[in-house]
Regions:
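Active-site-proximal helix/loop segments of hydrolytic enzymes
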Residues: 1-115
Length: 115
């Protein structure tokens, strides 16, 4: 079994500007249901660590770094699981930028696991 699940996305939202990165947090409406109730804090902690890692690398962060949406793939997972939005179609997708984002995500993973 995997230690965690991180799904990487760039929104196709039609915006004409780079909105930055954020993670999809677990909404209050499902936090009381199992298996969500037993695992949502892990999901949100992983997401927050990833955003902190991206921020430390100088990546643009959208708002407070999270948006609450009920996603079955993450909310109902029994391992730490998060959907990371790394920008959109207007974001810089150069190798340099992707490497910076990769370093930020690695930094966040290491922080989450106390490395």
């Amino acid at each position: 079994m995997a230690d965690c699940h991180i799904s990487l996305h760039w929104d196709g939202d039609g915006l004409n500007y780079d909105k930055g990165s954020f993670y999809i947090s677990v909404p209050d409406s499902v936090k009381g249901m199992e298996p969500v109730a037993s695992h949502w804090t892990q999901h949100n902690a992983l997401g927050a660590s990833l955003v902190d890692g991206l921020r430390a690398q100088g990546c643009k962060i959208n708002g407070g770094g999270s948006m609450s949406i009920d996603l079955t793939q993450t909310s109902y997972s029994t391992i730490p699981s998060v959907d990371m939005e790394l920008g959109n179609a207007c974001s810089n997708h150069s190798d340099e930028t992707l490497n910076i984002q990769a370093e930020g995500l690695l930094r966040g993973i290491n922080a989450y696991y106390g490395r």
